[in-house]
């Protein structure tokens, strides 16, 4: 029978060979404003090297580094965070090529109120070819940003060079940092295991069971990885989070003749405490039941955060629905019913999703409603990391209003 759970390639590789890639998908490092020290700039180079060599995506947060041209009081002048971003780009270019599928990613983050923010945003892509750039912000920081910064940021988003990340804090008020794909929030040196409910492999009555079983399996694995043995990552005893998410939603909806629009309405009714009607209502209720059950499991394991909707393309390609079609990534409708994956490692492979609703048929509003209502459901568990949410550039206008609505 098709598995209800889709493991990440990292987890499966680790199970098959614990000496190779580690099972954690992502990690973060907050760089202190010092060359030396356990969390200084030099330490960050070793940390990024370790993450890449063992298969994790690494987010490097640079906001604590002094701006370019400032002096440290000892006669030394700072070169600024952008100069160090170039080193991480070179590390990624070199190390990701040296091993079997150790193709981790690096994203450099900086807060919108850093003095070097415009330099960070406008650095030509050719100078930072092997990293992504992300700007961290919240309502207050956005409102305080000057017009030059806002204009540069909007242009960077439009051109595809800049990602946005919401500034978040944990339940104790301590800041947690966005990972590479922006769906997981971690303390510095923290890591996260990811796993997904294969919605396409579920009948409606399987959904809640899949949520609970998948979360329990993931939480049980969390204590067994030993990822802290190198001294680079936090130990599982104190680093308390996992990321359980979804893929193949479009397949599940197709198999039950439910449209995205119908499912969004049913989710909204469920969140409002109104029993949904028809098959869509039954499915929405099953999602609610499953999410609550999975949250109870995560609390049993004392997890601080436990849900994350990740960009699951590679994992979805290995996942099948009940009719044998490839499962679609995460919860969004696909652009087309088949996709060609052109990989330097595996060559060109074609995957067929079956007769699912595609993005042009669903429409932005219907998809966003499904995303918003699912996020509302997950948020109210108190255990949500986030969703690696992609806007649709052909229907969305990137302007200040876009940023404000996103915030």
Positions of predicted regions on the chain:
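Long, C-terminal-biased catalytic regions of enzyme "large/alpha" subunits
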Residues: 1-407
């Amino acid at each position: 029978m098709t598995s209800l759970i889709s493991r990440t390639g990292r987890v499966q590789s680790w199970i098959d060979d614990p000496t190779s890639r580690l099972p954690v998908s992502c990690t973060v490092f907050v760089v202190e404003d010092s060359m030396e020290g356990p969390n200084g700039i030099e330490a960050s180079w070793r940390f990024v090297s370790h993450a890449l060599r063992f298969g994790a995506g690494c987010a490097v947060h640079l906001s604590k580094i002094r701006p370019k041209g400032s002096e440290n009081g000892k006669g030394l002048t700072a070169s600024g965070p952008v100069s160090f971003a170039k080193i991480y780009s070179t590390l990624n270019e070199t190390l990701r090529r040296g091993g079997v599928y150790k193709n981790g990613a690096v994203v450099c983050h900086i807060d919108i109120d850093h003095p070097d923010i415009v330099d960070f945003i406008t650095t030509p892509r050719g100078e930072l070819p092997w990293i992504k750039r992300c700007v961290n912000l919240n309502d207050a920081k956005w409102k305080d940003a000057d017009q030059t910064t806002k204009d540069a940021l909007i242009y960077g988003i439009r051109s595809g060079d800049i990602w946005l990340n919401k500034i978040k804090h944990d339940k104790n008020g301590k800041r947690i940092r966005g990972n590479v794909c922006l769906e997981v929030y971690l303390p510095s040196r923290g890591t996260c295991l990811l796993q997904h409910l294969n919605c396409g492999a579920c009948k409606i009555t399987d959904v809640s069971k899949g949520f609970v079983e998948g979360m329990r399996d993931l939480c049980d694995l969390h204590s067994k990885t030993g990822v802290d043995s190198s001294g680079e990552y936090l130990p599982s005893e104190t680093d308390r989070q996992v990321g359980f998410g979804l893929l193949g939603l479009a397949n599940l909806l197709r198999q039950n003749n439910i449209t995205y629009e119908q499912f969004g309405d049913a989710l909204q009714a469920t969140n409002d405490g109104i029993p949904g009607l028809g098959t869509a209502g039954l499915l929405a209720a099953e999602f609610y039941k499953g999410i609550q059950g999975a949250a109870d499991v995560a609390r049993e394991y004392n997890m601080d955060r436990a849900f994350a909707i990740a960009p699951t393309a590679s994992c979805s390609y290995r996942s099948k629905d009940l009719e044998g079609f490839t499962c679609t990534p995460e919860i969004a409708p696909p652009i087309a019913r088949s996709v060609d994956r052109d990989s330097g490692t595996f060559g060109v492979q074609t995957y067929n999703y079956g007769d699912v609703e595609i993005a042009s048929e669903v429409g932005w509003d219907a998809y966003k409603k499904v995303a918003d209502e699912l996020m509302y459901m997950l948020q109210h568990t108190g255990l949500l990391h986030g969703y690696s949410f992609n806007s649709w550039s052909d229907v969305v206008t990137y302007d200040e209003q876009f940023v404000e609505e996103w915030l």
